[in-house]
């Protein structure tokens, strides 16, 4: 099922509407609602005389709506710093509408989201009146949970013993981690992610060891991250190269021969497909999965089928439970408009999975984002082995 892909081609004309386009319009509408809200009368905050005296300044004497308008020009980091100065600003900077604005503004630009940080879409769809009157959601807490910079900071504060344990454990691990890579992004993009990987000097690709060969699949490709962390990828295509090329030229979807479809009477949530025996052998030996999604904004998706394919591949019946899933939210080149990774995560129903996952923005041409994703999945495998 292995093959090669063309590196470049002509972009197909985008259809008039896309899944992401509709949500993008809703988010832009949310921004406008925010700016309208700050100009309307809102319930005034009550503060003691002592607090007013403590925070007495030109800014605090302004109407609260004007204060919030000014605060909206600060970065979230600066806003948190301001909140640490005194009790008045600590209360003021927590305004739910202000943080809802930041969340709607910044969420589409974040390059990764994981199983711990995916925000509930319901909190983004809440009418502005409910946010103002009820404030049921702590939007500041949601923002900090989702923000990649916050996640990175908490990751760097990991206890030292965890790193030492992982290092000692790695000394007795003989085989490098092995991953199964599959998904429409391997086949539909005008630039081949696989060819970019195979020509990467940074990853040092070499043929896998013959003794680890799987009949009909091969032994995969060995890579090396930062000249020390070795890993192996088994690249799985849905069908033959000839059929993939024809589907790309005709702008259709090739029949995916990795899976067999269940009868309608046997259909269960997320299990409309099962892997064929040949692929099942792959699922039994890998340490994790890499799903390459087509994240180009004009692309129409069969989200339920994609979710079912992921569920079939990661079925714990064919291997240990809790194996990590890396989703590469992939586009051909940097100038192609992409759908945000949080939207792709929701549409793939990744919140229904019972194992760690990460969605990482990636460019096939430059491999931007790929190394970040690989670092994450290698850390997850190390952590799982050390437990």
Curated annotation (Swiss-Prot):
Keyword Cytoplasm: yes
Modified residues (Phosphoserine): 12, 48
Outcome, altering residue 341 to W: Abolishes interaction with TERF1
Alphabetical list of Pfam families matching this protein: F-box-like
Post-translational modification: Phosphorylation at Ser-12 varies during the cell cycle. It is low in resting cells and high in the S phase and the G2/M phase of the cell cycle. Phosphorylation is decreased during late G1 phase. Phosphorylation at Ser-12 promotes homodimerization and is necessary for optimal ubiquitin ligase activity towards CCND1.
Subcellular localization(s) per the UniProt record: Cytoplasm
Pathway noted in the entry: Protein modification; protein ubiquitination
Effect on the protein of changing residue 76 to T: In esophagus cancer samples; impairs interaction with SKP1
Keywords, ordered alphabetically: Cytoplasm, Phosphoprotein, Ubl conjugation pathway
Mutation effect (residue 12 to E): No effect on homodimerization
GO biological process: cellular homeostasis; cellular response to ionizing radiation; cellular senescence; common myeloid progenitor cell proliferation; negative regulation of fibroblast proliferation; negative regulation of protein localization to nucleus; positive regulation of protein polyubiquitination; positive regulation of protein ubiquitination
Quaternary data: Homodimer. Part of the SCF (SKP1-CUL1-F-box) E3 ubiquitin-protein ligase complex SCF(FBXO4) formed of CUL1, SKP1, RBX1 and FBXO4. Interacts with TERF1; this interaction is prevented in the presence of GNL3L. Identified in a complex with CRYAB and CCND1.
Task performed by this protein: Substrate recognition component of a SCF (SKP1-CUL1-F-box protein) E3 ubiquitin-protein ligase complex that mediates the ubiquitination and subsequent proteasomal degradation of target proteins. Promotes ubiquitination of cyclin-D1 (CCND1) and its subsequent proteasomal degradation. However, it does not act as a major regulator of CCND1 stability during the G1/S transition. Recognizes TERF1 and promotes its ubiquitination together with UBE2D1. Promotes ubiquitination of FXR1 following phosphorylation of FXR1 by GSK3B, leading to FXR1 degradation by the proteasome.
PANTHER family xref list: F-BOX ONLY PROTEIN 4 (PTHR16008:SF4)
Name of this chain's protein: F-box only protein 4
Organism of derivation: Homo sapiens
Lineage of origin: Eukaryota, Metazoa, Chordata, Craniata, Vertebrata
Gene name of the record: FBXO4
């Amino acid at each position: 099922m292995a093959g090669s892909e063309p590196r470049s081609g002509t972009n197909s004309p985008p259809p008039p509407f896309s899944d992401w386009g509709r949500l993008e319009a809703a988010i832009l509408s949310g921004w406008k609602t925010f700016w309208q809200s700050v100009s309307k009368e809102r319930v005034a905050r009550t503060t003691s005389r002592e607090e007013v005296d403590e925070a007495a300044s030109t800014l605090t004497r302004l109407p609260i709506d004007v204060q919030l308008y000014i605060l909206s020009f600060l970065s979230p980091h600066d806003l948190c710093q301001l909140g640490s100065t005194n009790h008045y600003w600590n209360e003021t900077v927590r305004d739910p509408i202000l943080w809802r604005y930041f969340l709607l503004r910044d969420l589409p630009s974040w390059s990764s989201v994981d199983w711990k940080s995916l925000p509930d879409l319901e909190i983004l769809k809440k009418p502005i009146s409910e946010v103002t009157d009820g404030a049921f959601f702590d939007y500041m807490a949601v923002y900090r949970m989702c923000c990649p910079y916050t996640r990175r900071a908490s990751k760097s504060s990991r206890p030292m013993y965890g790193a030492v344990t992982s290092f000692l454990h790695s000394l007795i691990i003989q085989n490098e981690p092995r991953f199964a890579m599959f998904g429409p992004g391997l086949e539909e993009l005008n630039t081949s992610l696989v060819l970019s990987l195979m020509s990467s000097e940074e990853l040092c690709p070499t043929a896998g060891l013959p003794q680890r060969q799987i009949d009909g699949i091969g032994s995969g490709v060995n890579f090396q991250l930062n000249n020390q962390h070795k890993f192996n990828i088994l690249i799985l295509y849905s069908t033959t190269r000839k059929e993939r090329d024809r589907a790309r030229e005709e702008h259709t979807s090739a029949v995916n021969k990795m899976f067999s479809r269940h009868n309608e009477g046997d259909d269960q949530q997320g299990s409309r497909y099962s892997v064929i025996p040949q692929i099942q052998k792959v699922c039994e030996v890998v340490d994790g999965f890499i799903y390459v999604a087509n994240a180009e904004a004009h692309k129409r998706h069969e989200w339920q089928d994609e979710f079912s394919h992921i569920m079939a591949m990661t079925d714990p019946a064919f291997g240990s439970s809790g194996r990590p899933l890396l989703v590469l939210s992939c586009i051909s080149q940097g100038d192609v408009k992409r759908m945000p990774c949080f939207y792709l995560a929701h549409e793939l129903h990744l919140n229904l999975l019972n194992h760690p996952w990460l969605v990482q923005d990636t460019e096939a041409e430059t491999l931007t984002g790929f190394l970040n994703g690989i670092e994450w999945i290698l850390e997850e495998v190390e952590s799982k082995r050390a437990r």
